[in-house]
Structure formats: structure tokens, C-alpha cells
Amino acid sequence: MSRNVVITSAVRTPIGAYGRSLSGISPCELATLVAIEAIARAKVLPQDIDQTIFGHVLHTEPRDMYLSRVAAIGAGVPDTAPALTVNRLCGSGLQAVL
């Protein structure tokens, strides 16, 4: 069975200097915010999403290892949908798309 896969939306987290304005916001919180925004821009319902993939490099707390899962659940994606966090250093975002 073949299926067409489409990217309906993309949102990037902000970039800041180490220890500055974004230091009080965890990577999982940022990921949840961009997941919510990507879903809104795509005009789809969270329950219609069947997979979530995030690129992420530097873990600052234990739940960052599950960043994609944390963001998906926080954005209302069903817990039955797989979630994958990719760590390919500088290529993480691109690898997540592929």
C-alpha cells in the first residue's frame, strides 16, 4: 500500500544567545508552542496527525530525550501516534523532514 506523505506546515523555534532571553523556557515548552502553531497554520485537527518528528540536539533535562512525544501530547496529538526525536547535530531539522 502506498500513501502520499505531505508536509502541511512548518514552524521554527526562535534562536537566542546562551543564557539570555530564552533561558527560562525549556526546549519541551518551545517545542510544544511550535507544534501548536504548526497545527494551527496547517488547519488540521491534532487528532488527525498520525506521526510527529522533531529535530533536537542539546538535552537540558531528562524529558528532552522525548521532546517530540512531549510536544505532540502538549499540542493535543493522540498518544497513539508515534513520535520521533532526531539528533543529527546541525542536520537535525533537515533529517526530521526527510
What feature does the model see in each segment?
Residues T52, H56-L98:
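Conserved catalytic cysteine-centered active-site region
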Residues S21, I25, E29, L33, ...:
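Active-site loop-to-helix "anion-binding N-cap" substructures in soluble metabolic enzymes
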Residues M1-S26, E37:
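Condensing-enzyme catalytic core mediating Claisen C-C bond formation in acyl metabolism
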Residues C28-K43, L67-A71, A96:
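Short, well-ordered amphipathic alpha-helical segments that serve as non-catalytic structural scaffolds
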